[in-house]
UniProtKB/Swiss-Prot annotation:
GO terms for cellular component: cytoplasm. GO terms for molecular function: peptide-methionine (R)-S-oxide reductase activity. It comes from the Bacteria. This is Peptide methionine sulfoxide reductase MsrB. The active site is at residue 114. InterPro entries: Met_Sox_Rdtase_MsrB, Met_Sox_Rdtase_MsrB_dom, Mss4-like_sf. HAMAP family: MsrB (MF_01400). Transmembrane segments: none annotated. GO terms for biological process: protein repair; response to oxidative stress. It catalyses: L-methionyl-[protein] + [thioredoxin]-disulfide + H2O = L-methionyl-(R)-S-oxide-[protein] + [thioredoxin]-dithiol. It is an enzyme of class 1 (oxidoreductase). It holds the Pfam family SelR.
Length: 146
């Protein structure tokens, strides 16, 4: 499992995960990334989302219809910037991940988890076993295909 210490985070990763910041839309690593695999918490290495639930939302950030497990994310009321939103944090590391909105695809439950790329790390499908995430292979529709 991949893990990082807080002192290993770059400035943007620290701003996003520890200070509840937001990276620029359309200028982040995973907003337009659709390779098969999983997205893990940058600090704890815990799996949070899969490419199976990722969709194009035109918002400029990675968007997912659901989390891999409700046990790995925490949803909190966020009243910052004069808005009322639902913040998403990692359960294990208490890192800010992004927000969840009710404007996602209806056929997948209507949620859009809008996640900062700086808060997660992508693990390609073909590296899951090697990096200790082999138990997640059954979460993919076409197991064995890359």
């Amino acid at each position: 499992m991949l893990k990082k210490n807080k002192d290993e985070l770059n400035d943007l990763e620290y701003l996003v995960t520890q200070e509840n910041g937001t990276e620029p839309p359309f200028q982040n690593e995973y907003w337009n990334h659709f390779e098969k695999g999983i997205y893990v918490d940058k600090l704890s290495g815990k799996p949070l989302f899969t490419s199976e639930e990722k969709f194009e939302s035109d918002c400029g950030w990675p968007s997912f219809s659901k989390a891999l497990s409700d046990d790995e994310v925490v949803e909190l009321v966020d009243k910052s910037f004069g808005m009322v939103r639902t913040e998403v944090r990692s359960e294990d590391s208490n890192s800010h991940l992004g927000h969840v909105f009710n404007d996602g695809p209806a056929e997948t439950g209507g949620l859009r988890y809008c996640i900062n790329s700086a808060a997660v790390q992508f693990i390609p499908y073909d590296k899951l076993e090697e990096l200790g995430y082999g138990d997640l292979i059954p979460h993919f529709k076409d197991q064995g295909e890359k």
